[in-house]
Amino acid sequence: CIGYGEEEKNIKSLVKELNLEDQFLFLKDISQDAKNAFISKSNLFVMPSIIYKKSVEGFGIAFVEAAQYGIPSIGGIDGGASDAIEDGKSGKICDGNDLDEIYSNINELLTNNSYLEFGKYAKSYVKKFEWKNIIEQYKLIL
């Protein structure tokens, strides 16, 4: 887990309760290079955004960053995840408030290595967010 927030203590307690300490590493502030290294070695990127105190994840650049490495994402329906994830192809969109749905999506992608197929698609899908392609889209509009 990279980051911190009000739920950090609860998440750490849950990891301990489930005896998963050897499978989690909690990091707070890390460099961009370190973050990219962790993402590139992952099988799946999970950030089930929710509306919290009238605030929500905007575009979801983190999903694009993961896709650049061929890592599929699971994002919450609230916020900008659906702008960066093609549901059912480059990742999954779920209700970030529904733990069963989040688990089900994680399980689905990790079962039978489905994440590999999703990751390949994510790596090609993310090219639409490259500046040269965005500029071409603006030219069409103008």
Task: Enumerate the language-model features and the residues they cover.
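Short alpha-helical donor nucleotide-sugar binding micro-motif in glycosyltransferases
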Residues: D29-I30, A37-S42, Y138
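Nucleotide-sugar-dependent
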Residues: I50-V64, S82-D83
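Short hydrophobic beta-strand element within catalytic cores of glycosyltransferases
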Residues: F63, Q68, P72-G75, I85
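Glycosyltransferase donor-sugar binding loop
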Residues: C1-I11
